Swiss-Prot record:
SUPFAM superfamilies listed in its UniProt record: a domain/subunit of cytochrome bc1 complex (Ubiquinol-cytochrome c reductase) (SSF81648), Transmembrane di-heme cytochromes (SSF81342)
Source organism phylogeny: Eukaryota, Metazoa, Chordata, Craniata, Vertebrata
Origin species: Apteryx australis
Entry's Gene Ontology BP terms: mitochondrial electron transport, ubiquinol to cytochrome c
Any GO molecular function: ubiquinol-cytochrome-c reductase activity
Misc. comment: Heme 1 (or BL or b562) is low-potential and absorbs at about 562 nm, and heme 2 (or BH or b566) is high-potential and absorbs at about 566 nm.
Primary gene name: MT-CYB
Binding site for a ubiquinone: 202
Localization: Mitochondrion inner membrane
Membrane topology: Multi-pass membrane protein
Tagged with keyword Membrane: yes
Residues reported in the UniProt entry to bind heme b b566: 98, 197
PANTHER family attached to this UniProt entry: CYTOCHROME B
Name of the protein this chain belongs to: Cytochrome b
């Protein structure tokens, strides 16, 4: 019998073992679709970004007008630009759902996979931040100024570090040029880390909603989950295209239609919606260094979740108290997102401080406590 080429060819067998003959748990739900959706988002962003980079000019005097040129004069430039901008939002929607699913079903106990995933999140956040600066509108400029300035809170080397990042004494042409270079580079770094992420995942195999070992009941990835993923792509691309065609600027900031002006500060400086929860945590602490540490902790706290798992059960499927706490955390994050978009005044300051405190309380104290309590109740 002749060898099957997909199983014998050195390159094809890697694809075969990852996407065709991969043994997968038979009961994984739609929550397991977001990994492949993130892959589609990344490919879409790289392709649209490449096309945009062909027409974009990374110079302070030309950047804003080059975006206008793309939207007006380039064939389907408006579509490519809006797909790229809104694709970023969908990227973050998918990654937040993906992390939430990992948190709910205890996937973080695959420590290497989880840790590479957090590194991916941090790289994605960096990519989105430097990308937001490129149109060189008011919010781009002031967002870059405010966020890069946070590094000056680092004792002793802070100010030097900021000026080194800027390439001068303020956000100017060198800053824009290097941000464009970074924005081009980082997505390929994300693609590389994604391969490491998948390598670690395929060492252990996927988790499943019950959080139990599923070696005895595996099914091939193709055709079952390949088809399910295609359905997922369709269900994501429909809202993305709807947003892009009918309301492309819905998630953007009106300030960014004004070219960057270092002499005029916008009334409310705020990042894109997907960073608002972290921005609210940053603002809730009246001390600069404290705020920066809280901002860093809000994401880096994810590294601690495997260490804070005290339950004898992996998944939350049969842990009602932990479920309630999980949805409280989700509601808390939504409140933080809303507060981050509001001006710094009463009552938003107090709400932000309470929500920030609750965020860390739930993750660091209540989850381990409830996990231990459920052990006492069940076992």
């Amino acid at each position: 019998m002749a060898p099957i080429i997909r199983k014998s060819h050195p390159l094809l067998k890697i694809i075969n073992n990852s996407l065709i003959d991969l043994p997968s748990p038979s009961n994984i739900s739609a929550w397991w679709n977001f990994g492949s959706l993130l892959g589609i988002c990344l490919i879409t962003q790289i392709l649209t970004g490449l096309l945009l980079a062909m027409h974009y000019t990374a110079d302070t005097s030309l950047a804003f007008s080059s975006i206008a040129h793309i939207c007006r004069n380039v064939q389907y430039g408006w579509l490519i630009r809006n797909l790229h901008a809104n694709g970023a939002s969908f990227f973050f929607i998918c990654i937040y759902f993906h992390i939430g699913r990992g948190f709910y079903y205890g996937s973080y106990l695959y420590k290497e996979t989880w840790n590479t995933g957090i590194i991916l999140l941090l790289t994605l956040m960096a990519t989105a931040f430097v990308g937001y600066v490129l149109p060189w509108g008011q919010m781009s400029f002031w967002g870059a100024t405010v966020i890069t300035n946070l590094f000056s809170a680092i004792p002793y080397i802070g100010q030097t570090l900021v000026e080194w990042a800027w390439g001068g004494f303020s956000v100017d042409n060198p800053t824009l040029t290097r941000f464009f270079a970074l924005h081009f580079l980082l997505p390929f770094l994300i693609a590389g880390i994604t391969l490491i992420h998948l390598t670690f995942l395929h060492e252990s195999g996927s988790n499943n909603p019950l959080g139990i070992i599923s070696h005895c009941d595996k099914i091939p990835f193709h055709p079952y989950f390949s088809l399910k993923d295609i359905l997922g792509f369709t269900l994501m691309l429909i809202p993305l295209l709807t947003l892009t065609f009918f309301s492309p600027n819905l998630l953007g900031d009106p300030e960014n239609f004004t070219p960057a002006n270092p002499l005029v500060t916008p009334p409310h400086i705020k990042p894109e919606w997907y960073f608002l929860f972290a921005y609210a945590i940053l603002r809730s602490i009246p001390n600069k260094l404290g705020g920066v540490l809280a901002l860093a902790a809000s994401v880096l706290i994810l590294f601690l979740t495997p260490l804070l798992h005290k339950s004898k059960q992996r998944s939350m499927a049969f842990r009602p108290f932990s479920q309630v706490l999980f949805w409280l955390l989700v509601a808390n994050l939504l409140i933080l997102t809303w507060v981050g978009s509001q001006p710094v005044e009463h009552p938003f300051i107090a709400i932000g401080q309470m929500a920030s405190f609750t965020y860390f309380l739930i993750l660091l104290v209540l989850f381990p406590m409830i996990g231990a309590l459920e052990n006492k109740m069940i076992y």
